[in-house]
Amino acid sequence: MSLQFNTVALLLVVLILLGVLSNNSSVTISAAILLLMQQTFLAKYIPFMEKHGITLGIIILTIGVLSPIVSGKIQLPHLAVFLNWKMWLAVAVGLLVAWLGGRGVGLMGAQPVLLTGLLVGTILGVAFVGGIPVGPLIAAGILSLFLGKS
C-alpha cells in the first residue's frame, strides 16, 4: 500500500487538525474516515458515499432526534400546548430551518466546493467565538440566500 499525497489528502488532514483543535468530533471523525478510505482499498466505496452519504446522514440524524420521543424521555405535548404562541413560533422556525436545509442540499449538490468553506467557517466559529456546529446543510441554505441559488 502506498500513500497518496495530494491536495485532497492534505485538505482532509487540515480538517482533522481543525476538528481536533476546535473539539468538533464530527468533523474530525468524518475527515479521518474519508482519509482512511481514500488511502486504502476502501476508496472504491467513496462513490457510494458521495451518492448516498447525505441521505444516510439525514436518516441517522432523524433517528437521533426521534429517539427521545420513542424512549419516553420527551413526552409529546398536550393539544393545549399548541395554543401557546411560543409553540407556533417553534413550529415556524422548524419549518424555516427545514426549508434552509433543503436549499443547502441543492447548493451543495450544485457547488460542492463551497462545503469546504462552510466547514472551515463552522470550525473557526466553534474554536474562536464559542459557536456550536449546527451543520453544513443549514449553513449552505443560508449561503444560498446570499448567492441567490435554490
Swiss-Prot record:
Primary location group: membrane
InterPro entries: UPF0756_TM (IPR007382)
Coiled-coil ranges (or none): none
A Pfam family: DUF441
Spans through the membrane: 12-34, 52-72, 79-99, 123-143
Gene Ontology cellular component list: plasma membrane
Topology in the lipid bilayer: Multi-pass membrane protein
Keyword set, alphabetical order: Cell membrane, Membrane, Transmembrane, Transmembrane helix
Recorded superkingdom: Bacteria
Localization per record: Cell membrane
HAMAP family: UPF0756 (MF_01874)
PANTHER family on file: UPF0756 MEMBRANE PROTEIN YEAL
Family: Belongs to the UPF0756 family.
Protein name: UPF0756 membrane protein PM0771
Lineage start: Bacteria, Pseudomonadati, Pseudomonadota, Gammaproteobacteria, Pasteurellales
